[in-house]
Amino acid sequence: MERIRDLSSKKAAVIFTKSSCCMCHSIKTLFYELGASPAIHELDKDPEGREMERALRALGSSNPAVPAVFVGGRYIGSAKDIISFHVDGSLKQMLKDAKAIWL
């Protein structure tokens, strides 16, 4: 859990993913298209990935635990949540508030 907190606070936008996850790819692409440059942590390529995945579930991440998105050091949700925030316009404002994007 400590590693999740540490990694999620190092950059304005952080996404925990798995390299083979299509929804993870979609969320990363959305962030890039909005002008953000999130830190990406591929759990399937990290020796502590399984442990971090359990920690993400404990934070309230859904099943599957990825993508798990943090903005401004705060967990904001998984793919379903991020798409909802994008549709209602609040994702862009969250990214602006966290200084992950400027425009």
Curated annotation (Swiss-Prot):
Has a glutathione-disulfide oxidoreductase activity in the presence of NADPH and glutathione reductase. Reduces low molecular weight disulfides and proteins. It comes from Arabidopsis thaliana. SUPFAM superfamilies: Thioredoxin-like (SSF52833). The lineage of its organism: Eukaryota, Viridiplantae, Streptophyta, Embryophyta, Tracheophyta. Disulfide bonds join 21-24. It holds the Pfam family Glutaredoxin. Belongs to the glutaredoxin family. CC-type subfamily. This is Glutaredoxin-C11. The keyword Disulfide bond applies. Residues 1-102 form the Glutaredoxin domain. PANTHER family: GLUTAREDOXIN (PTHR10168). InterPro entries: GlrX-like_pln_2, Glutaredoxin, Glutaredoxin_subgr, Thioredoxin-like_sf. GO terms for cellular component: cytoplasm. The keyword Secreted does not apply. Keywords: Cytoplasm, Disulfide bond, Electron transport, Redox-active center, Transport. It is found in: Cytoplasm. One of its GO terms (biological process) is negative regulation of transcription by RNA polymerase II. Its main location: cytoplasm.
